[in-house]
């Protein structure tokens, strides 16, 4: 009797466990394979053999697709690094061409600037010498036109620059230089001797102003400068 009761209890327990049991379906390969990207390797066909290996298999497949691209990326990077000096050289050539076009477009101004470059350097180093040189610039042009006649004055400028500047400052007041350069050069050749005769610059200036009115100076400057001067004044 007890054995029958025990068997009945066992049957009731089995029936209750069967009623409450859950059914877990087996993993299907087709749905998971449809979710995978098409560019992965064929090794993904065996991914669903074990669900635990799924992340590892996917990681291996992605790595297998990326690794072949790495050498190509490195080659492109090295090629870009090698082309950087060529890019800099090309930029320098473009700048040089632009400067050359600018110089050709304004060649006259560029040449004039290059001619005045030594004077600009002299002005930066010694402003007094630069101003003195600018005062002598018109006379330098006349000396370039008549170099042989101006040779004594160049020697005077080398020996006594102060006397030479005083002498050249009187040049604009001489009307003879504008009328007859040849006669004026003859007069200038006698001027160093005349400076010893008339040491007063004011008297010499008055004499230069009266020079156009003296007919003897216009016809014969040598004879004019041989005339005596009494008391440092002209009568």
UniProtKB/Swiss-Prot annotation:
Ranges that cross the membrane: none
Any one GO MF annotation of this record: nutrient reservoir activity
Signal peptide coordinates: 1-21
Annotated InterPro entries: Zein (IPR002530), Zein-alpha (IPR051903)
Claim: Repeat is one of the keywords in the record: yes
Keywords per UniProt: Repeat, Seed storage protein, Signal, Storage protein
Record-stated family: Belongs to the zein family.
Role noted for this protein: Zeins are major seed storage proteins.
PANTHER family per UniProt: ZEIN-ALPHA PMS2 (PTHR48214:SF1)
Something else known: The alpha zeins of 19 kDa and 22 kDa account for 70% of the total zein fraction. They are encoded by a large multigene family.
Protein name according to UniProt: Zein-alpha ZG99
